[in-house]
Amino acid sequence: MTPDSSPSSVDDPLFESGHRIFANKDLLKIGHVPEADRIVGRDEEISKLAKRLNGAVHGYSPENVMIYGKTGTGKSLVSKHVCQRAQNAAQDGVEIGTAYIDCAEDNTETQAISSLAAKLNDESSTGISVPHTGLSTSKYYKLLWKTLDAQFDSVIIILDEIDLMNDDSVLMKLSRAEEAGKIDCSVGVIAISNKIQYVDNVNERVKSSFQHKELFFKPYDANQLREIMFNREDAFQDGVLSEDVIPLSAAFAAQEHGDARKAIDILRHAGEVAYEAGAELVTEEHVRQAQQHAEKDRFRELVNGAPTQAKAALLALTELSVNSNDDAFLTSRVYDQYEHICNHLDMDILSVRRFRDILKEQAFLGVVEIEKINKGSAGGIHLQNRLIEDSQVVRETILEDSRMQDWTRE
């Protein structure tokens, strides 16, 4: 029985004996992996990924897979779901290990490998102890290899938000471990990124070693978003959701790019807003308040997780927006401001081409909007860039980075 659904009373009057809004709030957690019948609109992606991992079920090598798609399109959920099913489907005598690494948290090679070793190790079975800190990267790799060979025939490793990893050689070392004679166990890597150009920017040796298939996850449409949320309706007590709550939450998420994570986040926040207000029902107004809150959270997460160069590019566009009556600026003008910022912060200045790529990545993430404008036969075609979020909010968020704060001391 979950804590939210428990009907038993508590002795302290400070705390409620149940929850008048939520019945099972865990269904609304971002990392929650639902049962197969609750996963919406991803049958084709599940089937394709399963084919790539099929070798592991029979004791052979799974393939490496690179998954692209915007935030909230089910990339992590489907990866975890298929890995769970592969473990359950393994032939008799075949042991499959799976591990999930969030590269936003474990963003160095040492952190990622030590986390993998700790998550995959069953000390009672292997007799191997994996300390959280204190060892060199090479020693953590050796512990990982020993752990894998002691327990598994195949291992599938999910590296989520791989673009935030500061050393892409981890892809090469994991995918080549068996070939290099480090282990007898087969290793397959599922690398997940919001950035469609990620592989184009990795080291050539890594690119050559990480032989992979690609999957692209399209955004959910409004109908799919509604179905996803109706499948989580039992997270709430019976009768507390007004009939317009789920359609409105889905509509807000569909306006962006079909972000299921955002839709679920809005629904959860709406319940929390209603609870804090002492309401008996979750209403449309609670959803609207939750949407504003979720949008700020989403934006801060995107900007705070961006590399330093991306923050400098966004700061350049932000400064132009704050100090001008215009809201859209040619790439050349934004680049001039970017150069000024980099010089002031003593940062390396990227080429114009790489700078354009960064702006495109931010447009892909929904932070920047890019529009082509035609200045005629003499002027040619140019790109204009504008911030989607309020410029003051963007500026405040970027300046939370200590490296960027020096800009305010100009």
Curated annotation (Swiss-Prot):
Q: Does the keyword Transcription apply?
A: no
InterPro entries per UniProt: AAA+_ATPase, AAA_16, Cdc6_C, Cdc6_lid, ORC1/CDC6, Orc1/Cdc6_arc, P-loop_NTPase, WH-like_DNA-bd_sf
GO MF, one term, reads: ATP hydrolysis activity
Its BP terms in the Gene Ontology are:
DNA replication
The coiled-coil regions, if any, are none
> Pfam families from the entry?
AAA_16, Cdc6_C, Cdc6_lid
Q: What is this protein called?
A: ORC1-type DNA replication protein 4
Origin species, per record, is Halobacterium salinarum (strain ATCC 700922 / JCM 11081 / NRC-1)
